[in-house]
Curated annotation (Swiss-Prot):
It is found in: Cytoplasm; Nucleus. A zinc finger (MYND-type) spans 49-87. Histone methyltransferase activity strongly stimulated by HSPCA. Zn(2+) 2 binds at C62, C65, H83, C87. Residues 4-240 form the SET domain. This is Histone-lysine N-methyltransferase SMYD3. It catalyses: L-lysyl(4)-[histone H3] + 3 S-adenosyl-L-methionine = N(6),N(6),N(6)-trimethyl-L-lysyl(4)-[histone H3] + 3 S-adenosyl-L-homocysteine + 3 H(+). It comes from Mus musculus. It is an enzyme of class 2 (transferase).
């Protein structure tokens, strides 16, 4: 058995944590984990396979609930142990669909009732997880009570009373644990496709300037060092989207994870001025418009996404710089819409405008920047811009060999793009 490179320890002021057992290099794989339980997120339901979380145009439905969808009979067969007990519950709740946290907890309970040890709990178990109940406001507690009631209604086909739950299982506390400890599972394009629980990885504390990153290969989690780490040094990840001001980061950390971030970046409001460059009234309007754009994206309404993004971008020409994070997010959405609509020339136009802001906001080796640069290189390759494509594909490789590792499926795709680009350069 491979020796662990990380160990649990008690920090001075942040409770439990993970630290390095020995010196670590950038790109070194520190931990890999399948989830204790996971589920497709609501926005990706019917778009990605419920088992492998990969997108496919034609997915086959579960013949019983007709809600779960799979890319192949093989995935459907592998998914059955996790889906079996929720199947009748999904069928009975139609047309209403449970929140992600409700479906996830249902799967967690099935795993806990199974009583087989899970590799995901090697360092920390579900029962060890922090719930932060004592720190929750009454409004938050009421929200958890509502979730517990929704859960009881959803699982009524399988669980009629507390005797059918694991011993000493507290539903209210379990939901608090799920909210605080679940991981958003992202696909190769860093888009949210699922949510899962990886108990050992819940030991990782937050930093706005982390020394590790997490990426996913389907539901499989990979933790890597992104810079040199000394033996005994605490390992950290960023819990949040990096395109947030210090005030926004602190608020989300306080609301979801119940702690105040006092890191140097938050204390000095690092990069806040860059993020909010431009006319405040205009970027606040764009910030509000992003809610509608994200809603349209969640329903894959790409024509409407693009129309709204273009209207915002055109109306704010010369008034809001691309480095403003809300303008940047609109450019990103416009690029995604163009890619999904097959408008590759327009997609490249928007993508190129994101390159410099991404360099500033995602310094060093960051998976989000690596994927963005790869997208730009791929778009340039498809338009015959071979020297430019080669430059960006190589840059993407340099970043992603650290963040993703050479065995990741996305790196394999990137190597094929590099080979294709090289062949075109040689032939021209």
């Amino acid at each position: 058995m491979e020796a662990l490179k990380v160990e649990k320890f008690t920090t001075a002021n942040r409770g439990n944590g993970l630290r390095a057992v020995a010196p670590l290099r950038p790109g070194e794989l520190l931990f890999r984990s399948d989830p204790l339980a996971y589920t497709v997120c609501k926005g990706s339901r019917g778009v990605v396979c419920d088992r492998c979380l990969l997108g496919k145009e034609k997915l086959m439905r579960c013949s019983q609930c007709r809600i779960a969808k799979y890319c192949s009979a093989k995935c459907q067969k592998k998914a059955w142990p996790d889906h079996r007990r929720e199947c009748s519950c999904l069928k009975s709740c139609k047309p209403r669909y449970p929140p992600d946290s409700v479906r996830l907890l249902g799967r967690v309970i099935v795993k806990l009732m199974d009583e087989k040890p899970s590799e995901s709990e090697k360092l920390y178990s579900f029962y060890d997880l922090e719930s932060n109940i004592s720190k929750l406001t009454e409004d938050k507690k009421e929200g958890l009570r509502q979730l517990a009631m929704t859960f009881q209604h959803f699982m009524r086909e399988e669980i009629q009373d507390a005797s059918q739950l694991p011993p000493s299982f507290d539903l209210f506390e379990a939901f608090a644990k799920v909210i605080c400890n679940s991981f958003t599972i992202c696909n190769a394009e860093m888009q949210e496709v699922g949510v899962g629980l990886y108990p050992s990885m819940s030991l990782l504390n937050h930093s706005c300037d982390p020394n590790c990153s997490i990426v996913f290969n389907g539901p499989h989690l990979l933790l890597r060092a992104v810079r040199e780490i000394e033996a005994g040094e605490e390992l950290t990840i960023c819990y949040l989207d990096m395109l947030m001001t210090s005030e926004e980061r602190r608020k989300q950390l306080r609301d979801q994870y119940c702690f105040e971030c006092d890191c140097i970046r938050c204390q000095t409001q690092d990069k806040d001025a860059d993020m909010l460059t431009g006319d405040e009234q205009i970027w606040k309007e764009v910030q509000e418009s992003l809610k509608k754009i994200e809603e349209l994206k969640a329903h894959w309404k790409w024509e409407q996404v693009l129309a709204l993004c273009q209207a915002i971008i055109n109306s704010n020409s010369n008034r809001l710089p691309d480095i403003n994070i809300y303008q940047l997010k609109v450019l990103d959405c416009a690029m995604d819409a163009c890619i999904n609509l097959g408008m590759l020339e327009e997609a490249l136009f928007y993508a190129m405008r994101t390159m410099e802001p991404y360099r500033i906001f995602f310094p060093g080796s960051h998976p989000v920047r690596g994927v963005q640069v790869m997208k730009v290189g791929k778009l340039q390759l498809h338009q015959g811009m071979f020297p430019q494509a080669m430059k960006n594909l190589r840059l993407a490789f340099d970043i992603m060999k650290v963040t993703h590792g050479r065995e990741h499926s996305l790196i394999e795709d990137l190597i094929l793009l590099l080979e294709e680009c090289d062949a075109n350069i040689r032939a021209s």
